[in-house]
Amino acid sequence: MVSQAMPMAAMTTGLADDEAAPHAAGAASGAYVAQLHTSLEAVKPLWLRLETEGVCTGHQHFAWAEGIVEGLVPQKADLAIVEVRDAATGEPRMLVPLMRRRAFHHWVIEWLSCGVCDYSAPLLADATPWTRQSAEAAWTAVLSVLPPADRIHIVGIPKEVGGVANPLALLAPARDSIHSHYGIAMDGDAETVVKRICRPSFVKALNKDLRRLDRNGGLALVEADTPALVDSIFGKLVEMRLSRFRELGRFDLLAQPPVVDFYREAAHRGLTDGSVRIFGLRAGEVMVAVQYLAAHLGTLHALLIAIDQGAVPNVSPGLCIMGELIRWGRGAGFDYFDLSVGNQSYKEHMGAVKSVLSELCYGITLKGVAASEAIKYRGRGVAFVRDNPRLFKVAQEFMQRWRRLRAPR
């Protein structure tokens, strides 16, 4: 275990809390220099430039990060946004949005996410390929300017971003996590896209369910394109989702008012910049499903879905709204539908492609090493349970009962 610890000197900056200064990355990473920023405003021009001209996901939009900082970052947490530049030319190569927070009497460096970013990926300056060597050199530069911490814990690292290798996934300490994400490419005519890209069994079930919904008073995909519709349809999403999760005995982030406010405000902002879209699927006068999406260039990210499973018997509203949104997305010019993180069976049923997410979880100090090892052991335990269906069912039922007992009445 001790061999995994990194020297604290590599993490110490000697800066005041709001000071930002460039640091050489050391002999091992002479190709890059890094600069620590402790406010969003300090990096706003560069962030917006990389967002529009570089490579990133919809989870790395500046406005998304701004909402996280304004409403979700814990009071005792510090922003640690690192700008990495080419040492020879001075040109920016990437922006790495991190934060430092207190966790059980030690400090941890995490992604600037607070639970509302499915993916952890730097904003890259361009599509220039990264190698393991260049990624390690850039990461050494990042570490050289971060504030003192006991461990690194970054989850949800996709292997690629926009077809470019994610530098974080190339690092030696990066390991496959127990989580995966799914996506499906969309091309050709919108009217036939579902039939062409999805599995025949999914298409058959989808068409059958759509006919049943249509017989229930007519079928309509409603976009929340006004402030009133955003409030109404998003409110329905929260209501249906919390009801469903209570029924399943599961916890949902939307049980926290600040998280609800974050998503609602992002949806209102999306009316102007198109970064967020909300759709409801209505059968007659009944809203049977709601989908919350983020949009970036040609990609639609499915972030939140809520369904009323009992509204129409023997129908899967979730599959129906997914099918309708694939058609809508292709018609609107999108070429990739990201089904986000989670191993739900409907994703494979559709024909989406699975990709395993990586994570960085390692200690810098002995205290951090101990905490990181505990997290890894817990992850192995979860993976073991998931790989044993009977054991998983028992564990799931136990957790559902436990959460119901703890839920307010």
Question: Where do the model's predicted regions map?
Answer:
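Acyl-donor binding region in acyl/amide transferases
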Residues: 79, 101-177, 295-355, 362
